[in-house]
């Protein structure tokens, strides 16, 4: 869990903080402050899912800086479209890494997508696919780097230490 969260923090385009949120929200992306805030003390899978959801918002829904290759800002998206995209990205990324968020994600997407027309939902599919792919690749690269750093640290810790005692010195009892 710690390595995965460290990888998420590294792929996030904005800083991530953990704190108590006074509203019902589990997290949020603040475009004006350029930061993500995640609710303290949630379970591991909820924390991961929320972090990925908010990173998706930071990549896709910052009006001044869309950060996904091949995605243009285009016309203004409704809040419901933004929520469907962010949660769908979170679900896809979490599923890839074996974290099942379907119970929460399906209800969340269904709630935000009700009343949407099929062409509007299809439009978001390419955005979801590209964003999830970019995040998965970034997370995998960061996890490899974290594991490489750990193995190098462990190798250094296991290097033999050679002590040389000079025979010319006298040691006095204390």
Spans of features found by a protein language model:
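Hydrophobic (often cysteine-bearing) scaffold residues that line and stabilize catalytic clefts
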Residues: 1, 48, 82-85, 124, ...
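Active-site helix-to-loop segments that bind/position phosphate- or nucleotide-bearing substrates
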Residues: 38, 66, 70-76, 80
């Amino acid at each position: 869990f710690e390595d995965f969260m460290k990888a998420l923090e590294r792929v996030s385009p904005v800083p991530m903080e953990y704190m108590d949120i006074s509203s019902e929200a589990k997290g949020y992306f603040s475009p004006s402050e350029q930061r993500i805030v995640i609710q303290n003390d949630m379970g591991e899978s909820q924390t991961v899912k929320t972090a990925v959801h908010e990173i998706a918002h930071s990549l896709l829904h910052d009006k001044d800086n869309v950060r996904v290759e091949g995605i243009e800002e285009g016309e203004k998206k409704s809040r419901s479209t933004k929520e469907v995209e962010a949660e769908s990205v979170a679900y896809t990324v979490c599923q890839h890494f074996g974290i099942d968020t379907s119970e929460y994600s399906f209800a969340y997407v269904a709630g935000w997508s009700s009343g949407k027309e099929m062409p509007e939902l299809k439009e978001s599919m390419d955005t979801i696919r590209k964003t999830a792919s970019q995040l998965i690749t970034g997370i995998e690269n960061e996890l490899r780097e974290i594991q490489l750093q750990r193995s190098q640290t462990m190798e250094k810790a296991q290097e033999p230490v050679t002590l040389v005692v000079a025979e010319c010195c006298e040691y006095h009892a204390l």
